Amino acid sequence: MQTYGNSAVTYGWWAGNSGVTNRSGKFIAAHAAHTGLIAFWAGAFTLFELARFDPSVPMGHQPLIALPHLATLGIGFDETGTFVGGSAVVAVAVCHLVGSMAYGAGGLMHSLLFSSDMQESSVPQARKFKLEWDNPDNQTFILGHHLIFFGVACIWFVEWARIHGVYDPSIGAIRQVEYDLNLSHIWDHQFDFLTIDSLEDVMGGHAFLAFLEITGGAFHIATKQVGEYTKFKGAGLLSAEAILSWSLAGIGWMAVVAAFWSATNTTVYPVEWFGEPLALKFGISPYWVDTVDLGSAHTSRAWLANVHYYFGFFFIQGHLWHALRAMGFDFKRVTSALSNLDTASVSLK
């Protein structure tokens, strides 16, 4: 984290990232615990929504988030999209809750039992995951593993659609989807993905992403930088704070894209499960409103789009904050300048 040359800098308890910056073991513990929290939310909220779900009311007209996604995947609903009971939904929720306990236990083990720094581990493979923030070889080695995991997740999604099937709103039923690896279609959908209307193209894009991510991951793991690590290549700029800022930029951008996509696309986000497409409005900031009158209620699509947008907005603000700090900008100078406005003067000499 940025210290502005002060080797004895301390942070408040709320600056959680600072406590794991140079402790790779604690860093992994925090990741595992965070994953456990996400899994717990997914499982608990799915059960909460299932308890409130009313089959007599269109799902898209109920304030639901988890159930519409499960319905899109064909979980808890038959081939025609009819609700067939909550046993499959409960099973998914319980798996997430059990997984959250396993992740939480892993976080506690890494925090309390294992070494706080992977460099001190007795396992040679573990020592490779030490944190050297200004070492591009170390950072790309870790990045490579992340990319492979993302690629495997894409493969799971593509294979689920191919073997089990997903909901196709064009026929109002669940069907198996074979991915289309037409590279010209994939290239074109970079610019019109908001209006994509073919599940084959959606799965083809994910299959192509899986190939790119796994190939890129293997490349980053196996290779090292060529030549000297100079300032032109980023020496002195690569740091924990810089990587945090880039991560926030990435997740913020994905959230904003998801907001626009979920607001209008009815192939990936079927009307049956998420409600009618939204209208974009402008006030203090952009927001989406329902195009159907539900009284004081809102569609699943409205919740999904607006929450993603505002989360994305604040993530991007966090990116700017940490990016400026990583570049050496001291925000305390701003508050200092403002506090001295009354006594500041201009000399003509």
Swiss-Prot record:
Molecular function via GO: chlorophyll binding
Membrane topology, from the record: Multi-pass membrane protein
Family matches, as Pfam families: PSII
Domain of life: Bacteria
Cell cycle is among the record's keywords: no
Biological processes annotated in GO: photosynthetic electron transport chain
Protein localization: Cellular thylakoid membrane
Membrane spanning residue stretches: 27-47, 57-77, 89-109, 202-222, 242-262, 304-324
CC cofactor: divinyl chlorophyll a; divinyl chlorophyll b
GO CC annotation, single: photosystem I
Keyword annotations: Chlorophyll, Chromophore, Membrane, Photosynthesis, Photosystem I, Photosystem II, Thylakoid, Transmembrane, Transmembrane helix
UniProt-listed InterPro entries: PS_antenna-like (IPR000932), PS_II_antenna-like_sf (IPR036001)
Known role: The antenna complex functions as a light receptor, it captures and delivers excitation energy to photosystems II and I. The Prochlorales pcb genes are not related to higher plant LHCs.
Similarity field: Belongs to the PsbB/PsbC family. IsiA/Pcb subfamily.
The protein's assembly and partners: The antenna complex consists of divinyl chlorophylls (a and b) and divinyl chlorophyll a/b binding proteins and binds more divinyl chlorophyll b than does the antenna complex from high-light-adapted Prochlorococcus.
Miscellaneous comment: This low-light-adapted strain contains 7 pcb genes.
Protein's UniProt name: Divinyl chlorophyll a/b light-harvesting protein PcbA
Organism whose genome encodes this protein: Prochlorococcus marinus (strain NATL2A)
